[in-house]
């Protein structure tokens, strides 16, 4: 059994007796809060946006199919065994429970379709897309390396934006320690 409680700010708190139930709950919460984002990314990664958005995104689909992230994720899904596989499957089962047990986001109504069941390969694809999207600054890193080579590290550092030492990295009022559900 899993219990999902939301605090006054809508933040979900998942209580479970084992990892399977916890991951099921996490998948369910993700479906509640982010189903359209998950579906859009799944279609983007798979090169299947044009199926619902039409001709204007066909070039994006072609590009994503050439990159082949979905194809690799499907191959990896076939290789995943034992506990790691069970964990990702528990998460997917939670997403699917969320899809079937609650109203769909308005985007599905507007585009007149229902999402397909979430799969292990969908989760692996998502991880690949996230890694790719977080690594797109390679051009900036290459430029930085060229500047260091041409100017030297000290002079190149002068071109970097400065972050004053007295400015916080984390806003103190946003930091909270939760010791039990009453402290929220």
Language model features: what each stretch is:
Residues 2-184:
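Substrate-recognition/specificity elements adjacent to catalytic centers across diverse enzyme folds
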């Amino acid at each position: 059994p899993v219990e999902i409680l939301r605090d006054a700010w809508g933040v979900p708190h998942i209580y479970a007796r084992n990892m399977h139930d916890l991951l099921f709950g996490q998948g369910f919460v993700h479906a509640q809060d982010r189903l359209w984002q998950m579906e859009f990314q799944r279609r983007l990664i798979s090169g299947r946006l044009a199926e619902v958005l039409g001709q204007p995104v066909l070039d994006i689909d072609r590009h994503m199919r050439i990159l082949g992230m979905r194809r690799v994720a499907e191959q990896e899904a076939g290789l995943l065994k034992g506990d790691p596989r069970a964990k990702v499957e528990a998460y997917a089962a939670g997403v699917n429970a969320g899809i079937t047990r609650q109203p769909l986001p308005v985007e599905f109504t507007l585009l007149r379709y229902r999402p397909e069941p979430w799969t292990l390969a969908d989760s692996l694809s998502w991880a690949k897309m996230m890694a790719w999207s977080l690594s797109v600054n390679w051009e900036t890193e290459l430029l930085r390396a060229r500047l260091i080579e041409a100017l030297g590290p000290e002079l190149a550092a002068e071109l970097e934006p400065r972050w004053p030492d007295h400015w916080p990295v984390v806003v103190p009022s946003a930091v909270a320690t939760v010791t039990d559900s009453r402290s929220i």
